[in-house]
């Protein structure tokens, strides 16, 4: 359904949302004029890819202390200021993908799905990262996906299609601002997009003064202001599956902040918790909650820096939600988080081991704590039957079903969903992000704030 043919009820809702945004942000601007805000030097913008309200709610319930009468707040809850609309400007689809949503948040422009910082005419649009670099600030991108994936790419590159990740890596190196590389810190996965038969971009970056690091220890030891860190051929392993040598999102965020903060003019940093979305596409509640924890720790690290610095704005949001994740299913008014805590690895990890020949029962009992979830013979048999197909997806789905049934979780899709997503903010001018906003407002506000410094 094309956006221009939206039902009357939805159009009315959008109109009311616009009115709410207008009132809220007019109030914020009035407050800004009457109260002197601290000088803003730095902006840290965090995106939980696919992190709709079902994910933030379920994560709260998962962390809840059952001994208390109320649900404890997460780090996100403390700084909730509003929510944002996510629709694209696409003639064929009115639910966004990550590229269109990230372009809206990076450049303030609605565009078609798959667009990387280009508009509907496929013309390049300036991003907030580029505007920050034009003003002499240090800049960085951090992600648990390939660093060339849709979200980070839409802040630091320009392309007609998110699929062109080699070309996006080329953009990171070749696109200059004031004669300098426009991204000082690049940390994430995607080594295969940089080290290719036609070119080795890691050598090119090193020749220009960047450090190149490939594991956690190298990253922590290196103090260079400019760094390229590629920790996996593609995306990083999920937090629950991650080996010790792979940095967490918090590790990468802290490393980026420490480097960028050396710039006297301040910095802009975009951090993406990429794989809440990937788990949602896979309908994997274990992976989703693992990645929520990884993202929360990175978010907390950014907030802690901002509290000490006092001149840093931290904004966190999502680009869309994924999977149609339902907290509760089958008409049963309960959701149980405890079975998730029994998992020591994701279903993906277990399925991969089984398809390579590992014993089904031993693998399940090795990676699912039997003191927390005692597997039934029927559950083991279902996975064993799936293993006979020698299809990793069938095995993965069978293991995921154990956790869905135990937690009473349901899913409606393997794709994205179109609901509004939460917005969190802390620091100078946080009130500008309050209320009902559009995803393009994120960039518009940041562009305006960059002019203040």
Residue ranges and their predicted role:
Residues 40-59, 105-106, 110-121, 125-156:
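Mobile, glycine-rich extracellular loop/lid and propeptide segments
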Residues 2-3, 36, 40:
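Structural motif marking the loop-to-transmembrane transition
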Residues 18-35:
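Sec-dependent signal peptide cleavage junction
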Residues 1-9:
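Bacterial N-terminal signal peptides that target proteins for export
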Residues 10, 14-19:
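Hydrophobic core
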Residues 40-42, 51-57, 61-95, 99-103, ...:
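A post-motif C-terminal structural segment
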């Amino acid at each position: 359904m094309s956006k221009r043919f939206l039902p009357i009820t939805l159009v009315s809702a959008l109109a009311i949302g616009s009115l709410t945004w207008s009132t809220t942000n007019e109030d914020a601007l009035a407050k800004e004029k009457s109260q002197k805000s601290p000088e803003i030097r730095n902006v840290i913008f965090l995106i939980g890819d696919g992190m709709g309200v079902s994910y933030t709610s379920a994560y709260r319930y998962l962390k809840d202390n059952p001994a208390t009468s109320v649900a404890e707040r997460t780090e996100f809850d403390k700084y909730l200021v509003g929510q944002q609309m996510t629709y694209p400007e696409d003639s064929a689809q009115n639910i966004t993908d990550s590229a269109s949503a990230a372009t809206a948040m990076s450049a303030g422009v609605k565009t078609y799905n798959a667009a990387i910082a280009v508009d509907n005419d496929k013309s390049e649009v300036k991003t907030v990262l580029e505007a920050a670099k034009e003003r002499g600030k240090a800049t960085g991108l951090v992600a648990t996906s390939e660093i060339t994936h849709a979200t980070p790419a839409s802040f630091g590159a320009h392309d007609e299609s998110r699929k062109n990740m080699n070309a996006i890596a080329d953009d990171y190196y070749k696109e200059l601002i004031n004669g300098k590389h426009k991204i000082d810190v690049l940390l994430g996965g995607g080594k295969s997009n940089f080290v290719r038969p036609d070119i080795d971009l890691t050598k090119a970056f090193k020749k220009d003064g960047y450090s190149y690091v490939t594991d956690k220890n190298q990253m922590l030891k290196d103090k260079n202001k400019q760094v390229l860190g590629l920790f996996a051929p593609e995306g990083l392993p999920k937090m629950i599956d991650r080996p010790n040598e792979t940095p967490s999102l918090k590790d990468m965020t802290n490393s980026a902040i420490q480097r960028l903060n050396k710039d006297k003019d301040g910095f802009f940093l975009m951090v993406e918790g990429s794989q809440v979305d990937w788990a949602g596409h896979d309908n994997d509640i274990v992976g989703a909650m693992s990645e929520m924890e990884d993202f929360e720790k990175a978010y907390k690290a950014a907030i802690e820096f901002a509290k000490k610095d006092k001149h840093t704005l931290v904004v966190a949001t999502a680009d869309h939600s994924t999977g149609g994740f339902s907290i509760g299913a089958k008409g049963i008014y309960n959701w149980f988080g405890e079975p998730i805590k029994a998992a020591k690895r994701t279903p993906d990890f277990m399925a991969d081991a089984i398809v390579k020949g590992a014993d089904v029962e031993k693998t399940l009992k090795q990676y699912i704590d039997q003191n927390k979830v005692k597997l039934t013979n029927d559950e083991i048999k279902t996975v064993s039957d799936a293993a006979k197909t020698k299809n990793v997806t069938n095995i993965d789905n069978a293991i995921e079903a154990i956790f869905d049934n135990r937690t009473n979780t349901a899913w409606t899709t393997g794709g994205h969903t179109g609901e509004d997503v939460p917005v969190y903010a802390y620091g100078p001018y946080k009130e500008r992000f309050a209320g009902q906003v559009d995803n393009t407002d994120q960039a518009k506000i940041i562009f305006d704030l960059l002019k203040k410094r």
